[in-house]
A protein has these predicted regions:
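Amphipathic, well-packed alpha-helical segments that form the structural scaffold of globular domains
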Residues: 252, 279-282, 293, 323-327, ...
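Short amphipathic alpha-helical signal-transduction/dimerization elements
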Residues: 531, 583, 649-660
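Solvent-exposed, polar/charged alpha-helical surfaces in well-ordered, non-transmembrane soluble domains
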Residues: 90-98, 208, 212, 216, ...
Length: 673
């Protein structure tokens, strides 16, 4: 070969190789230096996924630090439809159904339809609001086609079942039970998509053996995650603690920062009231995925911040004793007369408004209430209703101490004035308008102290007549009646007394009639205000909030009076002495002789039109010479208030026998009913 020709070829080959190398270097430079960030972002978008790492909810304790609600780490199973083609979606979900059925694992179902034919609507399964929103989006109904129960009126449950089966392209030859489960899963996916997500949770708290089967079986779209579930460390205080649920049923949370469609939120009780403290801050992680959607690596993460620890004002040991005493009293009454009844107790600390115990009967168990929900929802006594805060009852004679102090302070009477009780009080100028004292023969000559001790209707009716309705309402309102008490879980405002057309009902309002109604908590707080010298505090359940990590205090409740009612010491002493006389020498003294603390009390019999079904009410405070706690009890169809006295003594003794156990309890007392 010609050497020159060979040299030229060699030069040409070298030049070509140089050009190839140059192109490679330029491309590499562009990929890594010039446009490196863009290429990396594109790679991440293609092969990685951002995931939320749920923060565990904060722990709830009682006033002494005893844990009431905590968390337990669990495995959850999610389905991500973005990892499965639409043609393969039903088949992928059917594989999941077969696996869950084989392992005996319950699949979460948020579709508010019964699981079996004829597929009637059943809101115990899911939210009616979410269903209606979905059906409106499909143009199957409009928002006008919704009944008072929040469910469609123009589409039956069975018709919806058939339409959804068709909408989701489900094989008609499948067993009905399988079709219903598959419809539920597809509906859960549709609900998630309405809120901008492709992922939904279909099983929680699953066993590790199932996790192994999931990983080994290559179940398309299925992802394993970790979460936490609430653990209830007590069987008591269910109405106070409340429960959590899915955010999808609660629109109030959906637009708040820090929440996702998978979030668990507080629905009732302190779980709801202190959501901002308990929720915590979710973390974030970016994970790489293979073609099947399995996580192959983690690119970065932001650690979740658990919710804060919330300490309540209640003493759980005392709460348990109050609930047991109330249950025993009601059970004994029911055993005797066969009448089912509800009841409630509220115990408030004088001078702070701390709620030390709230008992509502019947109650329920937070650890099993979801399984018991159908039974609880149909129970005529409504076990999930918090009678202590939401119950509205005529106060009866428990209101007489307040009427008495109003009469003294307004100048309607004095501590020295005596009025003769003949047994029948007649409205001046109207002989047809009258009321009898419970003692038909009358009490004879009484002052205000004696009137309270003897629960004299004659004396109190005269005070109501002298003051008039406006003055009564003014004083009742000062003591917090007719308005919420401030408790964070919410309570009824109750109702102040009112007039009927053409009548002056002030004499009857004075001893607890005339259309007025209050909750047991309102009655307890009025007594706390009275025996506390006129300082009225908002009732509350929050004691403090601490960081879940360091334990550092983040918030401490600072009790300040919301109102101070001026009362002369002479007037107040006379009223409180009348209550003390009742407990020591009056109608309930036989019960209070066994009380380990000196107490003062007032009974109340609330007429319901049937003397056999009169409600019983009872209020107390103790110790008499240094009031620490106030208590109110109401037992529906409980008869006279005196019948509640023995229960009150049980609770007082339980409370004071525990005062030496902890400095946090010392100086607090209670009463029950």
């Amino acid at each position: 070969m010609d050497p020159k020709r060979f040299t030229r070829r060699l030069v040409a080959l070298g030049a070509a190789m140089f050009l190839c190398a140059l192109v490679f270097v330029v491309t590499l430079f562009d990929a890594q230096i010039v446009n490196g960030d863009d290429y990396l972002a594109q790679s991440i978008r293609t092969n990685a996924k951002s995931e939320t790492v749920k923060a565990s909810r904060g722990v709830i304790t009682d006033r002494n630090g005893k844990v009431l609600v905590s968390n337990r780490a669990v495995y959850t199973l999610n389905f991500d439809s973005s990892l499965v083609s639409s043609d393969e979606l039903n088949d992928a979900l059917l594989r999941v159904i077969d696996l869950m059925n084989a392992q005996g694992v319950e699949i979460k179902d948020t579709l508010p339809l019964a699981r079996t034919s004829p597929y009637a609507y059943d809101t115990a399964n899911g939210s009616a609001k979410t269903l209606v929103k979905y059906l409106v989006s499909l143009k199957w109904i409009n928002e006008k086609n919704v009944g008072d129960d929040g469910l469609p009126t123009t589409l039956t449950g069975s018709a919806l079942y058939l339409k959804l089966r068709s909408e989701y392209g489900i094989d008609k030859t499948l067993p009905n039970s399988t079709v219903r489960t598959l419809i539920g899963l597809r509906y859960s996916l549709a609900s998630a998509k309405m809120n901008g997500s492709t992922t939904f949770e279909f099983a929680s708290d699953v066993d590790v053996s199932l996790i192994s089967l999931i990983k080994d079986g290559n179940y398309a779209g299925v992802q394993v995650d970790t979460s936490s579930v609430r653990v209830y460390e007590t069987d008591y205080a269910a109405h106070v603690l409340g429960y959590t649920g899915s955010i999808q049923d609660w629109d109030d949370y959906k637009d708040k920062d820090g929440y996702t469609l998978a979030s668990t939120v507080g629905i009732s009780g302190v779980e709801n009231a202190f959501e901002d403290y308990l929720h915590g801050s979710d973390g974030k992680r970016l994970v790489t995925l293979n073609e099947s959607g399995k996580i192959t690596g983690e690119l970065y993460s932001v650690e979740p911040k658990p919710g804060s620890t919330v300490a309540l004002t209640i003493d759980i040991d005392f709460q348990a004793q109050v609930e047991e005493a109330l249950k025993n009293t009601v059970s004994s009454m029911t055993k005797s007369d066969g009448i089912d009844r509800g009841a409630a107790v509220a115990v408030v600390q004088v001078g702070t408004g701390d709620v030390l115990a709230l008992a509502s009967y019947p109650t329920y168990f937070l650890s099993t209430f979801r399984q018991d929900l159908a039974e609880l929802s149909t129970d005529p006594l409504q076990p999930m209703w918090n009678r202590a805060t939401q119950g509205k009852y005529a106060p009866g004679s428990t209101l007489k101490p307040l009427t008495a102090i109003a009469a003294l302070e307004s100048g309607a009477t004095t501590v020295r004035e005596k009025i003769y009780d003949s047994g029948k009080w007649t409205y001046p100028g109207y002989s047809a308008s009258y009321t009898y004292c419970w003692k038909r023969s009358g009490h004879g000559s009484l002052n205000v102290r004696g009137a309270i001790m003897n629960s004299c209707n004659y004396f109190i009716a005269e005070m109501g007549y002298r003051m008039g309705m406006d003055t009564l309402r003014e004083y009742y309102a000062k003591f917090g009646l007719g308005a919420p008490t401030g408790i964070e879980i919410g309570d009824t405002a109750g109702r102040l007394p009112s007039q009927n057309e053409g009548e002056n009902l002030a004499p009857w309002a004075a001893f607890g009639q005339a259309n007025q109604e209050y909750s047991p908590l309102q009655l307890a707080n009025y007594i706390a205000t009275l025996c506390g010298g006129g300082d009225r505090y908002a009732t509350h359940l929050l004691k403090n909030v601490r960081s879940s990590g360091s334990g550092a205090l983040e918030y401490v409740y600072d009790a300040e009076p919301v109102e101070t009612i001026a009362m002369s010491s002479e007037n107040l002493s006379a009223v409180l002495a009348g209550m003390h006389d009742l407990a020591t020498d009056g109608a309930v003294s036989q019960y209070f002789k066994d009380c380990i603390v000196d107490a003062a009390a007032k009974t109340g019999t609330i007429q319901t039109g049937d003397t056999k079904n009169n409600n019983g009410a009872f209020v107390c405070f103790a110790p008499y010479d240094d009031p620490q706690i106030a208590v109110a009890i109401v037992i529906e169809k409980g008869g006279s208030g005196a019948a509640l006295a023995s229960t009150a003594v049980q609770v007082l003794n339980a409370y004071f026998s525990n005062t030496s156990a902890s400095s946090a309890i010392t100086g607090e007392n209670t009463l029950l009913g």
